[in-house]
């Protein structure tokens, strides 16, 4: 999974902070749906990788019951944890027993 996340992270658009994030949601059928962060100059209207992955999953016809686990990787040495808005989305759209895996840029997972 870490290698997939590193490949996906290359697509992030982080021209302001240069902090890239990749997210992969694994579905019950083991299909992977991806997302990356997209920054905007105003700093407010960008999108987190988790938000993009969730939107992509719904766009592809999946529903909340299809979500199996979520993986998030950031481009720094620190473990990338979902922000407060993404935690709210995870709480709303994912079942309580959904596994959340958070990685740093070296693939260390928590």
Regions of interest found by a model, annotated:
Residues 1-110:
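Zinc-dependent deaminase catalytic domain
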């Amino acid at each position: 999974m870490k290698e997939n996340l590193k490949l996906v992270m290359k697509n992030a658009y982080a021209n302001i902070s240069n902090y890239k994030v990749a997210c992969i949601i694994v579905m019950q059928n083991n299909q992977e749906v991806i997302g990356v962060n997209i920054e905007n100059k105003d700093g407010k209207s960008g999108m987190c990788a988790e938000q993009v992955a969730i939107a992509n999953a719904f766009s592809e016809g999946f529903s909340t019951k299809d979500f199996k686990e979520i993986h998030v990787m950031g481009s720094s040495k620190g473990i990338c944890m979902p922000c407060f808005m993404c935690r709210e989305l995870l709480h709303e759209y994912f079942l309580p027993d959904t596994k959340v895996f958070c990685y740093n840029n070296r693939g260390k997972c928590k």
